[in-house]
Amino acid sequence: MMTYIVFILSVIFVIGFVGFSSKPSPIYGGLVLIVSGGVGCGIIMNFGGSFLGLMVFLIYLGGMLVVFGYTTAMATEQYPEVWVSNATVMGVFLLGLLMEVMLVLYVLKSEEVGVVFKFSSVGHWAIYDIGNSGVFSEEIMGVAALYSYGAWVVVVTGWSLLVGVLVILEVTRGD
């Protein structure tokens, strides 16, 4: 059952970003990003990463919501363009949706998913030990992995957010 929930959330996640990439109007783009961010947090929490899901929810949906609100206020239109009002926008959305359906069918047919990263040793990561049980805590392991092996991810993410805010401010500033 958990596999189907993650699969459905993943499809909603990708369809949301396909809807964002066809970008009919900034108002709908911000809404789709917020919904996709919430679905992404649900996927993370479904895999047991409640700490990481909470952090993504607080940082992404809390911090970037201010930017989305600001850009929506600066770029409001009296008659915003929707997905079905332009044949090109609708075609891009349907093409992305078709590609997603083809990918889903391919994954369901092959029934194998490979691991992207493999670590040679996890023995020196933090171990949460209660009474010599030898159990790894997912939360402590995730935080340790994020700040030790994934330090470059934190730096790239911070830099990407900074560049994103600067680009948004430049676009909304106008002439």
UniProtKB/Swiss-Prot annotation:
It is found in: Mitochondrion inner membrane. GO terms for cellular component: mitochondrial inner membrane. It is an enzyme of class 7 (translocase). Its EC number is 7.1.1.2. The chain crosses the membrane at residues 1-21, 25-45, 47-67, 88-108, 149-169. Pfam families: Oxidored_q3 (PF00499). InterPro entries: ComplexI_Subunit6, NADH_UbQ/plastoQ_OxRdtase_su6, Nuo/plastoQ_OxRdtase_6_NuoJ. One of its GO terms (biological process) is mitochondrial respiratory chain complex I assembly. Core subunit of the mitochondrial membrane respiratory chain NADH dehydrogenase (Complex I) which catalyzes electron transfer from NADH through the respiratory chain, using ubiquinone as an electron acceptor. Essential for the catalytic activity and assembly of complex I. Core subunit of respiratory chain NADH dehydrogenase (Complex I) which is composed of 45 different subunits. This is NADH-ubiquinone oxidoreductase chain 6.
